[in-house]
């Protein structure tokens, strides 16, 4: 449900904040289907430490990559509240970085993310 999704993202953000407060770089990858949910995460983590990376994949691309058959189950009604099928998905309006996975390989996508994120990480002086 929508409330379950919000709670899941809230918990992830709270744990991330604990790691960040300990000086640990934290990368999270999860489905956050609404702008509201992403704002909740950003508010918990803090704008300074929150970098939104939009991994952009069309429904068609997701279905082609779906080895578990979840999209098929969602389309048949076996799975309800499935993002992009029976529940909304709102694309980010202004992500820090967008990766179009239909055009980029896994290696190219990974490089693009790392090239963006690594320069923002401040390592403590030893």
Residue ranges and their predicted role:
Residues 18, 115-116:
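Short, residue-level hotspots on alpha-helical faces of the histone-fold
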Residues 2, 24, 103:
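Active-site oxyanion-binding pockets that recognize sulfate/phosphate
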Residues 7-8, 46-47, 122:
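Short alpha-helical interface patches
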Residues 8-12, 109:
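Hydrophobic alpha-helical membrane-association signature
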Residues 56-112, 118-126:
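Small-molecule kinase domains that catalyze NTP-dependent phosphoryl transfer to phosphate-bearing small molecules
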């Amino acid at each position: 449900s929508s409330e379950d999704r919000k709670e899941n993202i809230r918990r992830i953000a709270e744990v991330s904040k604990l790691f960040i407060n300990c000086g640990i770089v934290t990368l999270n990858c999860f489905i956050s289907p609404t702008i509201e949910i992403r704002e909740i995460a950003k508010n918990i983590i803090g704008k300074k430490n929150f970098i939104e990376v939009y991994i952009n994949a069309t429904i068609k691309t997701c279905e082609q990559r779906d080895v578990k058959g979840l999209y098929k189950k969602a389309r048949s009604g076996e799975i309800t509240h499935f993002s992009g099928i029976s529940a909304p998905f709102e694309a980010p309006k202004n992500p820090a970085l967008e990766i179009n996975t239909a055009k980029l390989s896994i290696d190219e996508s990974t490089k693009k993310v790392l090239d963006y994120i690594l320069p923002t990480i401040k390592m403590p002086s030893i």
